[in-house]
Amino acid sequence: MKKSDKKKLSGEIIKRLAKEYPDAKCHLDFNSPFELIVSTVLAAQCTDIRVNMVMVPLYKIKYKSPKNIIKDGEDNFRENIKSINFFNNKAKAVLSICKTVVDKYNGQIPQTMDELTSLAGVGRKSASVVMGNCFGKNDVIIVDTHLKRVATRLGLIENENPEKIEIELKGIIPDNEQFHFSMRIGELGRQICKAKKPDCEGCFMNDICVSAFK
């Protein structure tokens, strides 16, 4: 599909997503950029539900700031998150993030892509989640498994590599729509366009989707 055709298609998709999911929100529960960046790192290859179950009580009782995690220590933090996949590596990453944030940023989570991705365990996807949800940055594409699957099925992207997908979508989605597009297409992926059994019959995109009913 030509880029001009993809732009036209994306415009219609953006309108439909906005109508269907006007208030799409992050599925990780958080009250601060600190909580979201920690939960985002912990959510890699784990469910948001599990991370919320483990971390929400801990944020309220023990971990109200990066300094609290540093003070508690890596061993205790690891023990508290052991029901989360890959807890050993994630505990190391979170402790590293907390130390960097305290030492370099006066305890505040940085706001730019370069600064965020310099933190341990934080890639472009996690950085985009924090930038969009906490700092009001609309010009971020969150390339997660749902966006990748749904955007491919809709015919918007042809790449497999996350960074190439990001570049491709930034070329056809207006800057001020990119974050909302990411959140809303994620909802479509969770609720209708599922990995194994997409509900094409019940999908509000089935008349413009190149993969519908296939």
Annotated model-derived regions:
Residues 2-214:
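Catalytic cores of DNA base-excision repair glycosylases
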